[in-house]
Amino acid sequence: QLIAEQNGFISSPVHASISGTVKKIEEALTSQGTYVPAITIESDGLMTADENIVPPAVNSREDFISAVKNSGIVGLGGAGFPTYVKLDPKQNVDTLIINGAECEPYITSDSYTMISKAALISQFFELMKKYIGIKKIIIGIEKNKPDAIEVMEKLAESDPAVTVKTLPS
């Protein structure tokens, strides 16, 4: 469920990760020593999705970018950079680089996602090809993630646009 709206071009909406009740909105201290707005939600223990959430209708490049924008997808490299900005329709993008070598805590999540969600990743690649014009996909994975490498190499066997690059750990 949407809990915070985008307030500028280089920002994104925020969705609740749990179902429950908003208890407070206040400034919270981050591990970097700065204060940021934070929303505290008391979980109801049910993890139910808002019934108003429906998959977006995507029939064009603009629809696809809008769906990515409204979903709140951001990069995990520290800045939380909105993904939709990278898909700007004024730019001609033909290569997608997937960073499967992020630092902790995300490297474990990256590896798990590549192993357990290969079919969804493949669907995402097809959408990127169809709506953004991607021709080449490069997935970088650290060599100490052999299971993720194996699964992504199998995906690459069925998609000539995909290349897996093993990176030093």
Regions found by a protein language model. Give the residues of each.
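Short hydrophobic beta-strand segments in globular cytosolic domains
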Residues: 2-3
